Amino acid sequence: MNKNYMKIKRCLDESVFAQIDNLKYMQNLRDNIETYDEKKINEFFDSLMEYILLNNIDIKFKRFVVFWIDYIIQNYSVKINNSLRKKVNDIIITLDIYPLLYDKNYCKNNIKYFNLFDEISIKIREKNNKLLSNVQYYARNKILERKNIVFSAPTSFGKSSIVIDTIKELIYCNKIKKVLFILPTKALINEYRRKIKENIEDIIIIENPHVTTDFSKVIYLFTPERFLVFYENNKNVKIDYVINDEAQILVNINKKKCVGRSILLAKILSIISESKTPIIFLLPYVSKPFDTFIFKYINIDREDVIQISDDMLPFVSNNYYMLDVDENGDLFKYDFSKDAGLEFANKKYIATSNCSFNKNSLEDWSNIIIDNITKIINIEKKFIVFCTSKNQIKTIAQRLIKNRICKIDNISYRMQALINYIENNIGLEFELITFLKNGIAVHFSEIDSYIRRQIEIIFNEENDIKGMVCTSTLLQGVNLNAQNLIMIYGNRFSAIGNVDIDFRNLVGRSARLGINIQGNIYNIAYNKKIEKEGERLYTSSDPVKINFDKIIKEVKKNPNEIVKTYALDSQVRSKLKDELNMGNDSSIENLDYFIGSESAKKVEKKISEKDIDYYVDLLKNIGNYEKTLLLIQELSQIYEWEKNPDFDVSKRMKNIEYIARLAVNVFNGESIRTMINKNINFVQKNKDYSLVVCKNIMGSEYVRIVHKKNIDFTNMHIFVRERDINTYIYTMLYDVQKIIEFYLKKYIQDLYYRIKRINKDTIKEVEEILDYSTKDKKKISLNNIGIVDNFAISLLTREEFSEFYDFNENIKIDKLKEYAYSLPEYDPLRYAILDVI
């Protein structure tokens, strides 16, 4: 039974609140019970400043103050009079939350409200058009000193911006020349490339691990996998500084989906720490990350590491709400915004469900929320709906359209360019077009680089997309900023890695410095305990505490092959390896980490049983259908795909002919639309084959080509274009990104390096396919300057664009830029170029 209110663990003692004037008025103003009263608000901030000056205040009180400063700036900045503005400024300076002075809603003509001392202090802190707090300034100075740094801070603290800005200073002063960024995903690499290009002019950025040129000044952007390949060929290259973003990946060695990447990063850190290269770790707000887990990975003395983490005061804040539905179908919210000084989470009526409601049905929860979303949030402000599956994403998006929630009157040029791109390259029938035209975007792992980038830019910078519906894949991309976040999930939060870190990472999407300094977070009761979930929300601004010893114990009980590879590697010297204690050291090659040392031995035995020249011939002719087909057949046998526990490898990839055709099409730069039409035509011409719709072990539908002979059509249905085309588009997007770009390339790469180890020969054709999915020199040149979208690469390598290349087939960047600016603003090619160079 629903309660009318629930007790909250108050952020401060009653004796403290007794000294704050008009707190109840401020709380009522926030609830729209009171109206704006200049006198009362001035008295409230007077009492805050008085308390700050007369007491030793702790982090809890500071958060309370930040909450109300964020509230007043975000909601009433245009009404703030001179007297109140000066008081707010004084508090901001006293609490060292300087960046708020430059908030877009607040900074206009602000300088005249400072005294001379404050003006000098502000001038000193102003770096790269940003105003730094003491902590940020300290971090900057330690980077300038090229220290080892562990920088853990809340979302929107500006960690990556501080690093890029300071690295820029070091490069321009010739203090450093070669910088390495280790980043977990290609999406983050693309985002970093964009940020670096905006800040550091004329710097060479390299993503290709096979580059051997020793540049005088260069920034390398690598995933862990790519760094190992680079290191294999460039062991003598001296790196001046290393930055590892998303370093929390290191705690995921007990997560089945994450352990491979975690151990690859662990191996890299072992290499870097042995070289004595200074390193910066960036990660979300974790309590003492160096002392709890990072120190176990690197061979660096504690006194040589600067740790910036605990008691970090965020500049932004959130309102937290739990949504519940009672037995009468009435939708309520409970306000758990602890930092507002609330003592009780009061129950507030929102609306009544128009149909029957099952509290254990996520579909019913989605329906009642979407049907009443205008009563829950201010729909003029951007929102994100987080859910657990791609099917749920589509259902929610379709209901938003049905209710005309996000209808937009005008479409920006960039949005029109995105729609044009989808129509030409993905398919006219793709439902994402309908979503976008109705002001809604969906975000899932299979969307290609162009769609992902445009959606993220439009959502952050334009007004076309008001709502975003996503799964946990949002956590792997760049920061998307929305004032409102609604979470619709069942009993358990669906995390990629550590649950507490991922949960806080998601919550951090709502409040962002310079955009929305105070956000609104909504979670559903489902059949969870509301008090417990409410507490989880209002403690999400606290640092995560990691029990890494417990994680190590879990790993030791059932270590997988990659963990064993690390634990037995004679080249690794780390406390983690010592604690894993899995036997005598052995000589392990760096590239054995891709499949594990035991699997590597089996693979090399199989390779030795055939003529090496046979494999070399297949690899050199990769892209030719017959040779690619033979190569994939060999890979399936060498790596025993049928025994692989991964459904995609053991089931989806056993159709060798389909995988070969798909791979050749990808390597030739074919669009999704073209590949789908080719497959449909293939089945129509070859009566022995059928296109069918199946379900995977998770119940999600996908389309596949099957040979009619010996196929049981139970649990399948024949593909009908009008009904199943969207399923096919999603399937093809998935197959390209996951089956070809991830799995197939992984096995091609491993085979190639084992062959190369034997005959010492470089096969450029393979390296180019692995890095660029092409062997065309012009396409590779485009890729090297950051143009990664296949449609743009295919267009720009046509004969009519030869003027953009020099005699070595390198890009004339200025000429290409000039051409891009001449294109219509609704042309997708314009943004494929200008977004990255």
Regions found by a protein language model. Name each.
Residues R10-I93, K112-F117, K564-I837:
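C-terminal accessory/interaction regions of large nucleic acid-associated machines
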Residues N110-K123, K130, N134-N141, V150-F157, ...:
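Conserved C-terminal RecA-like helicase domain
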Residues F181, Y220-T223, I243, P278-P284, ...:
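Structural recognition of the conserved hydrophobic beta-strand(s) that form the central parallel beta-sheet
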Residues P224, D245-A247, Y489:
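Walker B catalytic acidic pair
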Residues N233-P278:
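SF2 helicase catalytic motif II
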Residues K238-I243, G467-N491, G519-I524:
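A short beta-strand element within the Helicase C-terminal
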Residues S270, T277-R399, A441:
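Conserved interdomain linker/interface between the two RecA-like ATPase lobes of SF2 helicase motors
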Residues S273-I280, L480, R492-F493, V499-S541:
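Conserved segment of the helicase C-terminal RecA-like domain
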